[in-house]
Amino acid sequence: MALHQPKSVKEALSYTPGVSVGTRGASNTYDHLIIRGFAAEGQSQNNYLNGLKLQGNFYNDAVIDPYMLERAEIMRGPVSVLYGKSSPGGLLNMGQQASDHRTAQKKFSLKPVLTACSRLVLTLAMRWMMTAFYSYRLTGLARSANAQQKGSEEQRYAIAPAFTWRPDDKTNFTFLSYFQNEPETGYYGWLPKEGTVEPLPNGKRLPTDFNEGAKNNTYSRNEKMVGYSFDHEFNDTFTVRQNLRFAENKTSQNSVYGYGVCSDPANAYSKQCAALAPADKGHYLARKYVVDDGEAAKLLR
């Protein structure tokens, strides 16, 4: 991750054997993975942070920025026996960056980066060993970018303070926290086969920046997490460990998404498509609202 600087955890895992990450194209709204052919109903059943499950639901799942992590691990196979309800294919565990008493140095870095797609990234990393027993780490990030689809934007601001107390070689207590605000999470939709893989009835294809949503689509998310990790080694055989975390996630979503072209049999009973002439149905994309399940049609040009 330090070498490739991925925008999301799923992007960091794109070359992992047995893991599929492209179910939503270029969208980084969620880290949905398919492991060994199995997909979880929601990533909150399948994604862990510091050994604890990231609680949530399908539209209110937490997402951790890869810059805040020191590792991302894939556990393949049916792991429900050990970890509870999860996908038969396996699960994802992420390890957050924490202060390390072995890093006996002061380090501070502030890096602004401007990349393709008008992407501006400002990162902050600071760690310091205060004494032989105490150390802390502060990691932050601010990112703003235009998404591939026209009118879509990504904004993320995150900070993760960590503090470690290590009174001896056998005892370790680490305070971990993570705060993230995303006023805009970017594009979260999909395009129809007609106009992309296959041409439209008029022989044309949709532009690569085509957005099937509405101009006022909004999708914001706010995450707060506070917890600790404690372990004490009594001897070579017995060790006590305890992890605890309190988390609060809030999302606000009001968006329109594509539901296939009107000529698709799945949309035969759609009110918006039924009003069209048969010759026009191949030119219109059926759409629905996430919030109130309303409907609206959009002309494909």
Q: Residue spans of the language-model regions?
A:
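Transmembrane beta-strands of outer-membrane beta-barrel proteins
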Residues: 107-111, 137-141, 176-178, 243-245, ...
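Outer-membrane beta-barrel translocator/receptor signature
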Residues: 56, 67-70, 81-159, 167-171, ...
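Membrane-embedded beta-strands of outer-membrane beta-barrel proteins
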Residues: 33, 72, 122, 159-161, ...
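Periplasmic plug
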Residues: 15, 31-78, 82
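Residue-level signature of outer-membrane beta-barrel architecture
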Residues: 112, 126-128, 165, 232, ...
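Short sequence motifs at beta-strands and strand-loop junctions characteristic
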Residues: 27, 63, 84, 113-116, ...
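Short, glycine-/polar-rich solvent-exposed loops and beta-turns at beta-strand/coil boundaries
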Residues: 12-31, 60, 65, 85-88, ...
